């Protein structure tokens, strides 16, 4: 507030509190529906779109859901064929990277038009100055992860793709990082997922949004 020079919180997410969620029952069907609904909402688009497919679990799930709905126009409740019925997927990496092979297998399975972009170490080094300029941070981890995404984004843009979906945020929501396995109890596991979610915006989301 400008009159008191104080920061006031106007909205609280009830799921941040462990006590508010500790008795919730796990439901794979509820998770499936929430994921499908979330992806489907993003496909209401009159411009070409694609998916970032690393070959990992998170991006593979999002890509598979997108591929399920892509052939029909979401805007018409699935009653008309989509203007761009073939979903395009994109992967980036050094030649021979195991993730690229995994992405190929997933793309073949879900039927996307797959594009694999390779870059060299020197190309990555040459791009760092531009990457730092665009993401507006010198954070080493963020710059390192943003560099291949920046190189990939340039190719995607040159193809006329205006929007892409990715698997960002899944590890934070579902505790996918390896160190989560060492959580001493459910309460600390939950508190760490909340902490990671709060850190998404200044780190991973900056990379995904600005690269």
Show which residues each predicted segment covers.
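Short acidic-glycine loop/turn motifs at beta-strand connectors
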Residues: 1-6, 169
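Conserved S-adenosyl-L-methionine
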Residues: 8-10
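ATP-dependent adenylate-handling active sites, centered on carboxylate activation for C-N bond formation
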Residues: 13-211
């Amino acid at each position: 507030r400008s009159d008191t020079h104080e920061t006031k919180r106007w909205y609280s997410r009830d799921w941040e509190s462990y006590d508010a969620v500790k008795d919730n029952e796990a439901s794979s069907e509820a998770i499936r529906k929430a994921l499908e609904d979330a992806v489907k909402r993003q496909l209401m688009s009159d411009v070409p779109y694609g998916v970032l497919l690393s070959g990992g679990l998170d991006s593979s799930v999002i890509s598979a859901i997108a591929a399920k709905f892509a052939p029909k126009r979401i805007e018409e409740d699935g009653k008309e064929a989509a203007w761009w019925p073939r979903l395009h997927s994109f992967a980036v990496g050094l030649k021979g990277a195991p993730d690229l092979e995994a992405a190929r297998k997933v793309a073949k399975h879900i039927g996307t038009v797959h594009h694999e972009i390779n870059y060299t170490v020197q190309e990555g080094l040459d791009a760092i100055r531009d990457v730092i300029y665009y993401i507006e941070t010198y954070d080493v981890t963020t710059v390192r992860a943003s560099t291949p995404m920046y190189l990939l984004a340039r190719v995607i843009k040159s193809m006329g793709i205006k929007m892409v979906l990715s698997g960002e945020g899944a590890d934070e929501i579902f505790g996918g990082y390896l160190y989560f396995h060492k959580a001493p109890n459910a309460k600390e596991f939950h508190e760490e997922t909340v902490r990671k979610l709060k850190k998404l915006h200044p780190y991973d989301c900056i990379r995904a949004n600005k690269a």
